[in-house]
């Protein structure tokens, strides 16, 4: 679905619905950590709605194929009257028309199936006592969600979003916290960015914060249009510039001192103490990460620390207390972690 600037327009209700959340995510006297909190909250609480994203493609294709299917018989009858068409070609054309009919039916099934899937999901999640009320609430929520411009109230209620919803939510939170921000806009994608020391850092659905050049490389793009809100409601977006990827900002070198600094900060996050006393005979457990080395700088540092900490914690959960040490290293241009996990000597009796 093409991104229109109207899709990320805010209103009073959007700002009101996100004000409390913004206050919760605010980190005192540290705008960078506040932004990381916003991004981590979205990463942990909002799920990308592939159903909503796909349904627009289904509908678009359905309309195009449907128009072809509708006008084809008239065009074909006209061709038969004007031209001399052999029986073989007639059979081939009939077969093609039959295939188009099947494709049209399949895409119709896709649209209906996606709608019913979302309806059933929200029917199940509804807290209403009556089944009739559950059906009504599920239907209303589904229609609200798949609408082109979804309200933030619906996004926060359903915890489903696509890129423009993420951007709208991020913008509303940052507006409430008086943090100046920008929109990076493609025909099919939009993200939010902040400018620190004359350089753009991108907030795009998941941790970590990305340097704009690394973000462009990740998307396989060479340039992006940048806009800034003229007023608090994004009712007008002012074009700022067209940013072109700068290869000079894509360096995959990182010093051992920085790796040790990341290592120490991850240990603090996970409360790993006395790491120097770990058993070196323990075979490390490798944890691969998708964060490129070239994304590191002082601004992205803490967001990278949070990603690594979450990956390790999600792997070991409450057994994180048995992790005696970690080592951060480079692996094919990306960060990687060796986790030293020591199995306790005794297992508690389950009786």
Curated annotation (Swiss-Prot):
**Name of one Pfam family that matches:** DUF553
Which Gene3D superfamilies does the entry link to?
A: 3.10.620.30
Can you name a GO cellular component term?
plasma membrane
The record lists the membrane-crossing segments as 58-78, 91-111
Q: Which UniProt keywords apply?
A: Cell membrane, Membrane, Plasmid, Transmembrane, Transmembrane helix
Localization: Cell membrane
Q: Does the keyword Transmembrane helix apply?
A: yes
Its membrane topology is listed as: Multi-pass membrane protein
Can you tell me which family this protein belongs to?
A: Belongs to the UPF0252 family.
Protein name in the entry: UPF0252 protein MJECL39
Origin organism of this chain? Answer: Methanocaldococcus jannaschii (strain ATCC 43067 / DSM 2661 / JAL-1 / JCM 10045 / NBRC 100440)
Tell me the classification of the organism that encodes this protein: Archaea, Methanobacteriati, Methanobacteriota, Methanomada group, Methanococci
């Amino acid at each position: 679905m093409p991104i229109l600037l109207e899709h990320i327009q805010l209103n009073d209700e959007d700002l009101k619905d996100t004000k409390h959340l913004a206050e919760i995510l605010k980190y005192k006297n540290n705008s960078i950590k506040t932004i990381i909190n916003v991004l981590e909250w979205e990463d942990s609480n909002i799920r990308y709605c592939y159903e909503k994203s796909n349904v627009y493609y289904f509908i678009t294709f359905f309309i195009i194929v449907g128009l072809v299917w509708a006008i084809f018989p008239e065009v074909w009858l006209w061709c038969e009257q004007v031209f001399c068409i052999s029986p073989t070609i007639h059979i081939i054309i009939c077969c093609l028309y039959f295939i188009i009919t099947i494709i049209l039916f399949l895409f119709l099934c896709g649209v209906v199936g996606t709608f019913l899937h979302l309806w059933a999901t929200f029917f199940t999640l509804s807290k209403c006592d009556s089944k009739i009320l559950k059906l009504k609430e599920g239907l209303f929520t589904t229609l609200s969600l798949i609408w082109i411009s979804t309200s933030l109230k619906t996004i926060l209620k359903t915890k489903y979003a696509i890129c423009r919803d993420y951007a709208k939510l991020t913008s509303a939170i940052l507006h409430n916290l008086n943090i100046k921000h920008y929109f990076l806009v493609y025909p099919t994608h939009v993200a939010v960015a902040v400018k620190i020391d004359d350089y753009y850092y991108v907030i795009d659905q998941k941790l970590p914060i990305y340097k704009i050049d690394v973000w462009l490389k990740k998307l396989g793009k060479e340039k992006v249009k940048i806009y800034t809100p003229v007023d608090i409601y994004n009712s007008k977006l002012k074009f700022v510039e067209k940013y072109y990827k700068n290869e000079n900002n894509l360096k995959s070198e990182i010093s051992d001192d920085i790796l040790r600094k990341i290592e120490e900060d991850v240990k603090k996050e996970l409360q790993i103490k006395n790491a120097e006393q770990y058993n070196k005979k323990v075979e490390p457990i490798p944890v691969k990460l998708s964060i490129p080395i070239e994304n590191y700088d002082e601004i992205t540092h803490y967001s990278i620390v949070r990603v690594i900490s979450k990956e390790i914690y999600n792997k070991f959960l409450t057994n994180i207390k048995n992790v005696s040490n970690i080592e951060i290293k480079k692996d094919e241009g990306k960060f990687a972690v060796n986790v030293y996990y020591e199995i306790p000597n005794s297992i508690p009796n389950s009786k």
